[in-house]
């Protein structure tokens, strides 16, 4: 008899399609100064406040409504009239924390998100359940870069042997690099993928939100296959039914995560240092996710920070890996050097993408991007003082081949974003 209980159902289904937490702060700041907020006021005020910090063009009018809805469920604002909302005591307290104690502000926001959505704890638990033998590492596939897939006419929706071969080779490559990262039966994968690919092709092409005749419209097989892969992998791995245990975590089908919501939750949970992800690992065709936190009955290690308000359905507390510098110094420096050398050997150029180095060091050491920045800053200062036998150079330039990655999370040291790193041994 299974004694594991269901997860508490969320009070709000459907996360807002934004990932910038400073939108909460700015909306509350407007509510405090103006005495209220509504959609029209946010549309006018927020773009001016976040210009240079957020891609303003990416904030749609729907996002403003999502923002109001979430702030209401968090208890930070309350409805006063048909369209106007006023800041609450809890909202004032959170706004104050944003100014004087950012760590506590993050804690408060995470606690509210857990209460409302349940997703933070559930998502981390699901990663561990999907790949318990390899530290919760999971891959959402994308077609291999060397796959040659030509464009087709929109109406040509045939699933070919070539698509089957590419789809199988893609997941086998990922599983070869990281064991257990894709717990999906191959034959079922191909069947589900074919159905989704053809479903996408059955839809009419659109331009500027309008359907257009498909007679002269071409489409990219790679793009359609990529979207189909991501859609069905997210549906399989992050639905209310656990694909490994075949048991339900929630009763309501609205708890199934969509690909769109998945793309929001990944950066949100990374911002909370619960997990990391990357779309740019050269060895992995797709998005690689891995937790940097885990659920435990108890903990005696000083390298972990507890979050008592984050519990799984077995009532275990979530602990985030937060090692201190003195405890991880040697491992960090050694790993940084090894990862840099691996990239250098493959690319044979001195300056390597700092984002690529960051992603792999974080994966190997299970540390957050924030800790990586702190530890890199310390290591850089040690190199300047010749306390290590290596010189480290950091550059803010962006190479031409890095333009497509400009929207990736940056690496910041002392408030400056760096994009390239070079490491050379000091010969005595």
Model segments located where?
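Donor-sugar nucleotide-binding helix/loop cap in glycosyltransferases
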Residues: 2-339, 350-353
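Intrinsically disordered, low-complexity segments enriched in Gly and acidic/Ser/Thr residues
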Residues: 324-389
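C-terminal engagement modules used by replication, chromatin/transcription, nuclear envelope/ESCRT
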Residues: 272-276, 282-314, 385-428
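Short alpha-helical linear motifs
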Residues: 134, 379, 397-401
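Intrinsically disordered, acidic Ser/Thr/Pro-rich low-complexity regulatory segments
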Residues: 248-255, 265, 345, 351-365, ...
